[in-house]
Amino acid sequence: MAESAGKPQASKSKTEKAKVEKNRAEKTDTSRAASAKSGSSRENAGVKADDTVKANSGAKISAGAKAQTGAKANAAVRPEAVPVDFAADPTNYVNRELSWLEFNYRVLSESRDKSIPLFERLKFLSITASNLDEFYMVRVASLKDMVHAKYAKPDIAGLTPQEQLDRISERTHELVEMQYSTYNRSLVPTLRQNGLRMITEHEDMTEEEAAYTDEYFRKNVYPVLTPMAFDSSRPFPLIRNKTLNIAALLRKKSGEDEELEFAMVQVPSVISRIVELPREIDEDGKERRVVILLEEIIERNMPSLFLNYDIVASHPFRIMRNADLTIDEEEAVDLLEEIQKQLKKRQWGEAIRLEIEDNVDKRLLKIIRRELSINSQDIFEINGPLDLTFLMKMYGLEGFELFKAPRYVPQPVPALMNEDDIFTNIRKGDILLHHPYQSFDPVVNFVRSAARDQSVLAIKQTLYRVSGNSPIIAALAEAADNGKQVSVLVELKARFDEENNINWAKMLEKAGCHVIYGLVGLKTHSKITLVVRMEEDGIRRYVHLGTGNYNDSTAKLYTDCGILTCNPQIGEDATAVFNMLSGYSEPLAWNKLSVAPLWLRGRFLRMIRREAEHAREGRPAHIMAKMNSLCDKEIITALYEASCAGVKVEMIIRGICCLKAGVPGLSENISVRSIVGNFLEHSRIFYFFNDASPEVYMGSADWMPRNLDRRVEIMFPVEDEVLREKVIHILEVELEDNVKAHILQPDGSYEKEDKRGKVLVNSQEQFCREAILMAKESADQEDPARSRVFKPVMSSN
């Protein structure tokens, strides 16, 4: 939380921590000579000396950066390779894709939890559906591409691409079955009991409801529809990715021709899929709302689309297509133009998944399967409405606020409540931000204030994902209009945000900003803003560094951390980062920051191995790490070695985890938990005990090959003692969570912690309470009268 609130009670002194850690430390496997002391190795981070990464604007990063010592020890080096005994056995690792599916099961478990408000359960079920869509469009599509290319190299868990596809299909069919069991057997009946009837089949309508929907169809739907036939003169219709369609088998009413015809119609996305009917009175005399899905109305009225034909069978269906972009950046003359071309192809990629009703006419299914070239393992026969993402729209229905969690309002940051000038506040000391518990407004205000401050000379920022009506973009454009030097790296390759980012890039260029499209072969995923300001004592650099995107919308839903600072060394590093991104620059070393792809992997490995060395020497050793995903084999193997050396390793990993935890002789000192709650856990935090001199870092990178090797990422230290204790407090509270945490078991499954006899700890709710309390205390100190009119922060709106 913000630095003005003092140290949390949960934090322990260095002496107390040392005693606790010493009691847990074990000296094992002392013969592992390959583990080196911190900083002892000087290899060059796994990149050949002549390798370079060229920027689209002409910048390049040289892998020949030389290691330096002293204050600049964090150079482009890599520790020696880890021993191969753990790495050689694929059974020591979990397949990435199967691990992701287990994460989606954890999200699904929230929709099955009856202690959660009903409409929140709808939301979680919708999220599992949208997650699965993206998983198929990207990950499954990539595996299919490998199979087509006859690529059969096993992954870290020893599975070939085809073996992965087979297991994914099996596990996904089980997941989908559980999704619809939850929907049909739990959610729909519970909705009905609480005043909302879902008409699941159009045959179930009353006469009045049928008449209403028929009139609705005639006035609002029929004019929009385009029925499409398939015969020798008309090819099979092109079906866009993720669209909902209704296929039909037809037989002509007149004549003796028994031949069946195939036709289809797309369910229009321009009309709301959820149609509300007149309210009804239930068995108890209470008013109840009634809704039906648009495809049910269309299916009921199919005869009006195919006059003089009998509808033999009709079934909704939906396909998923390969949406993974293939861009040859080296050959592209204009990266922006090339991405725009590829985006047009995304809607028409290879069909990789088919959803259709479970009672489908097999003759109709045969036609669809043949024309789309769909494998049997990629066909999902569904017992319920296709595409459960509509439940997110259901969540938005008004009148059901009692069945939703109270809306949390992000709190003001205490350190920024007493001064109007944000730069004055930052000069007083580094400021820690913890979103969404604390407001994202200070980040927006930082950029906006810089745009309007006459003393500001330049603003530089990286953008990966921003909101649809971004105040950050508006502030950058305003800054350029005010004559400031504005440089923005807009990452055009941010998946599924490519089109938005292209539009923002064009707008910023028109506003007079210098826009960089990213680096060839790399994604720029770092979150950094640099403001250069002329002050009485000369130039001062202000920096924001964060773990999450500059997106004011998702900042209300994702848990992230950030720091505002004017530390001169961080400012110098920030300048070097932007010089590296925008021009010809070859940083040899860094003062405070660690930057991927050349420097970050080696930094992490050295710190992990340092803890292992301390444990072997009989000293306390402890690692705490929080991230979205862990699937890097080299990092995992280093953690296994640390565990065997006696290092206690505690990790909070929301999503993918390819590490096996709690396995004797391998990882008995490693624990992993995944927190799934109202907010999406997104921050990356790393703690190393370091012989009772703890080091704490935050950053944009997960422990994944893509983050460490193929992206520009930044890790930054938290050096202020008070702020460091607060970040440690975040980790400690999440490690105590026994309400929303799922614990990884040695067999790879996840289980909720046994709460019997324990004080319940919901980390997200605790952070909400802490933020409310700190903001109130700060407001009361500023003006005691405000304590009587303090704004409530929990709202049902």
PLM feature spans:
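Glycine/threonine-rich ATP-lid/beta-loop region of ATP-binding domains
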Residues: 633-636, 640
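Hydrophobic alpha/beta core scaffold segments
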Residues: 648-652
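Cofactor-pocket helix-loop regions in the catalytic cores of large enzyme subunits
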Residues: 628
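N-terminal localization/anchoring segments of enzymes in phospholipid and broader phosphate metabolism
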Residues: 2-623, 641, 645, 657-797
